[in-house]
Structures are given as C-alpha cells and as structure tokens.
Amino acid sequence: MTYTVKEIFYTLQGEGANAGRPAVFCRFSGCNLWTGREADRASAVCTFCDTDFVGVGPDGGKFTTPSDLAAAVSSRWPWRSSEGSRPLVVCTGGEPLLQLDSAAVEAFHDAGFEVAVETNGTQPAPAGLDWICVSPKSSAPLVLTSGEELKLVYPQADAPPERFESLDFDHFFLQPMDGPVVARNTRLAVEYCLAHPRWRLSVQTHKALGIR
C-alpha cells in the first residue's frame, strides 16, 4: 500500500506517560471522525481536534513501501548521539490505524525503533505494537479496549471518565481540552483527578514549551 503522511519530525513527546521522551513523530493523513475541513467541524464526531492532518506537508510524503517509510523516519533520529537509548517512533494522525499495518510496524522494528501509536481506538491495531495510547472521542465506539495508556480529553459530554475505567490499560490520563476555556477545563480535570486518584493529569507540555 501507499502510506500518505502529513509530516515526520523529531521532538519531545509532550503528553501522557512518555512526556519528555525524545521521539520521531510520523503523522499519517486522514481521519474517520473528521475530514479536517473547518466547514465540517460542527457536524464531526470529534469537534475539538487541534491538528492539521489533511494531505501531504513539506515534511511528509507518499511512501510506496514500508521500508521507504521506515527510512524516512530513521533519517530524523540522531543516531550518532543516542547510544544507550532506544529510538521511539510515535505514529499519530489524524487516525494512524487507517494506514499503519503490520508491514510498517515490522519495518520500524527492523530499523531499530520502538513503535507507539496514538489512536482514537475505533480501528483494529496491527500486531507488534510496543505502546498503544487510546484517546476516546465522544460517543465513537471503541474497538481497542486494552493497551498501555488511555488518554481522555476532558471534559466531553458523551465520554465521561467512568465509562472507560473497566478497560484494560496500564495508565489512565485526563487531558484538559484546549481552546478558549482551557483554564476552566484544566481546573475541572485537576479536581476530577484529585477526587478519583486512578486518573492522572496530562498537560500538553509541548505547547507550553513552544515546540512541535
């Protein structure tokens, strides 16, 4: 298959359990919960997305083989100065599981990478992933109900935290919804975490730091 990628870049993971860890981000184009066009936002399942995942950007491309995609990801990693660390690629979107398959996961592994995915959880995952982070969106039904991390953007009227507490994840995070009322949402998330200690707070540190 041809992999359509919006952008590939090297940065620090800004969210969740791996916050602060260097990683190459591979942002796949397309999503099943929103077209990415502002004209369609109000009618989308996910109305609060803050990411441009439409088409191919200058740091992305179309890759016709898994090895070509893995080579593009590998070219961003600072191999000469990374002795003793395990390279990490974070497959994100959009919705990466519309494109990410077992062949790509295998190619990433062959290139020396640990493979993480950030997904809305509505699509099945290929075998071999090292880290699955599910971020539920509104009332969209989940296909993925187990993994390493569940990260819930909060608050969502159709996605209360208690709906997900029986699922099989190692970490449960609330992340304040960004936007005009982010201060209010942060306060609500803090209050919920304090009242329900199973949940931890995730903040978008990359935005605070001004990095990608």
Please report, for each region that a protein language model flagged, where it lies by residue.
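S-adenosyl-L-methionine
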Residues: M1-Y3, E7-A23, F28-G30
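Generic marker of residues within folded, mature protein domains
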Residues: G16-N18, A39, E191
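Surface-exposed loop/turn and secondary-structure junction residues enriched for glycine/proline
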Residues: I8-E15, G57, G147, I211-R212
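Conserved Radical SAM active-site core
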Residues: Y3-K6, Y10, L33-L129
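Conserved beta-strand segments that form the floor/walls of ligand-binding pockets within enzyme
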Residues: T4, F25-R27, V90, C133, ...
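A generic secondary-structure signal marking the coil-to-beta-strand transition
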Residues: M1, P22-V24, V45, D130, ...
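Conserved AdoMet/S-adenosylmethionine-binding subsite of the radical SAM
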Residues: E83-L88, P96-R212
